[in-house]
């Protein structure tokens, strides 16, 4: 398995050497972060001090948690400040012109390293990650890929090492896709057996899962439809990891009107997953969307999380964007939601199962490159609520230069903890194109957070974050001539749209 992976990587990275055309986009960013840590501490239960309502505290005023029968109680106290300086470099490469029409190579790789001595920044191991790396053969009716790939569908994002084939039937407007390979862990470009995922401990699979899927798509003038089937199998136990099917589609019955929706069914678990139905109407000056949604989280059968019977929620959401004047844009968003019954007995606690959230905002084009944006948000839901506002001012005198200053405020009280978070944030960021192939970026942010609570754990969480970056484009070949600067700045080039 590792041999095949390195063969694919060598073939892809060797592409620019033998190809007639290539494109390499190198995005390097460094951050400097200063943040407060916490320390787990304990105290003898006999040394705690009760308050008037039965709560227990340490002699110096920290609220503690005591398990029945335990000699010691635990609590968190203020820890030392940490400084981290993560450096992340992402390379996106494509090569073509190997002497075979339609043959190309593609790779996206990431290198991360913490320049500080603390080593407290998460996600730095392993230092090198191959996100994608595959050879592609594409002609009018056929596209075939071999290597590390990431496919997006109604079932989410699927990463695997293997092969994928798409067959197109232009007259029928039908595309058929099939793929097979060794799966990657969800949300990360690592196999599920990687040591970086060792917190799974005894639940970590001993072998990589085998993933297979089929997808059919019809794309017409007035709409489209897709059907997806996907299964994952653990070869060590010869058991299903997941098996799901999904359908989705959209229709455009008239100019400006789009109706779309879809649903998925978890065959392995035997229940319906997520579903949604939305209606969008757009004119020159106003756009509105109304969406009904049902969401249920999906967990693979090898994990322990499925045993907790994840509860779905249903929501109704609406958004409106209007432009009453040429230089003014208004937008509003609102949503109400409700969780299904959890079928859990809580005789001593009453809790909420529904909530709502909303947002109002405006964007003003002040002219001569100036843009002003601002808005307010409000949310009330199970366990917490929030009230906030924010705004930004952007100056972009040319396409090659932009600088923004922004600030926001958020008040977040918690229902089940005697703690209220008040967060204030201010910062700036900007970028400039030195030429068509080099772009520099920089920024700084200050987060000022206080926890209002009646014990000694109400300490300050204020931190600074400073960023700097450089994007460099190396290219050769007629296919890249006359590309707009906005396309060159995209993380995935033209394919990122």
Locations of the language-model features?
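Positively charged n-region of N-terminal signal peptides that target proteins for export
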Residues: 1-5
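Gram-negative and organellar
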Residues: 19-497
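Bacterial N-terminal signal peptides
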Residues: 6-15
């Amino acid at each position: 398995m590792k041999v095949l992976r390195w063969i694919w990587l060598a073939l892809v990275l060797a592409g620019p050497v033998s190809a007639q055309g290539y494109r390499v986009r190198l995005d390097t960013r460094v951050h400097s972060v200063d943040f407060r840590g916490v320390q787990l501490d304990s105290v003898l239960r006999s040394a705690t001090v009760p308050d008037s309502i039965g709560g227990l505290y340490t002699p110096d005023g920290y609220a503690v948690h005591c398990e029945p029968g335990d000699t010691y109680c635990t609590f968190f106290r203020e820890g030392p400040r940490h400084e981290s300086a993560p450096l992340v470099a992402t390379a996106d490469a494509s090569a073509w012109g190997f002497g075979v029409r339609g043959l190309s190579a593609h790779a996206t790789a990431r290198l991360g390293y913490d320049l500080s001595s603390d080593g407290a920044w998460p996600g730095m191991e392993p230092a090198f990650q191959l996100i994608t790396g595959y050879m592609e053969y594409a002609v009018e009716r056929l596209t075939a890929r071999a290597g590390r790939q990431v496919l997006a569908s109604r079932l989410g994002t699927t990463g695997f090492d293997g092969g994928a084939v798409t067959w197109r039937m232009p007259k029928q407007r039908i595309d058929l896709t099939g793929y097979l390979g060794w799966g990657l862990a969800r949300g990360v470009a690592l196999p599920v057996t990687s040591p970086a995922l060792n917190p799974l401990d005894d639940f970590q699979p001993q072998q990589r899962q085998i993933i297979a899927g089929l997808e059919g798509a019809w794309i017409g003038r007035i709409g489209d439809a897709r059907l997806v089937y996907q299964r994952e199998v653990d070869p060590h136990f010869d058991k299903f990891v997941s098996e799901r099917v999904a359908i989705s589609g959209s229709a455009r019955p008239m100019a400006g009107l789009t109706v779309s929706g879809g649903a998925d069914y978890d065959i392995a678990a035997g229940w319906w997953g997520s579903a949604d139905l939305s209606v969008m109407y757009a004119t020159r000056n106003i756009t509105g969307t109304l969406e009904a949604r049902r969401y249920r989280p999906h967990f693979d059968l090898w994990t322990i999380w499925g045993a907790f019977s994840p509860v779905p929620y249903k929501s109704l959401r609406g958004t409106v964007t209007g432009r009453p004047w040429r230089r003014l844009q208004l937008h509003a968003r609102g949503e109400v939601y409700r969780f299904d019954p959890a079928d859990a007995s809580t005789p001593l606690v009453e809790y909420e199962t529904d909530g709502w959230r909303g947002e109002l905002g405006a964007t003003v084009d002040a002219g001569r490159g100036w843009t002003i944006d601002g808005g307010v948000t409000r949310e009330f839901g199970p366990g917490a609520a929030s009230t906030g506002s924010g705004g930004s001012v952007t100056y972009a005198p040319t396409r090659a230069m932009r600088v923004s200053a922004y600030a926001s405020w958020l008040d977040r009280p918690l229902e089940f903890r005697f703690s209220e978070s008040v967060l204030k944030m201010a910062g700036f960021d900007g970028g400039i194109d030195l030429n068509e192939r080099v772009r520099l970026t920089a920024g700084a942010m200050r987060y000022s957070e206080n926890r209002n609570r009646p014990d000694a754990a109400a300490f300050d969480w204020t931190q600074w974050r400073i960023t700097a970056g450089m994007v460099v484009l190396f290219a050769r070949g007629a296919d890249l001539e006359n590309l707009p600067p906005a396309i060159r700045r995209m993380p995935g080039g033209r394919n990122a749209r």
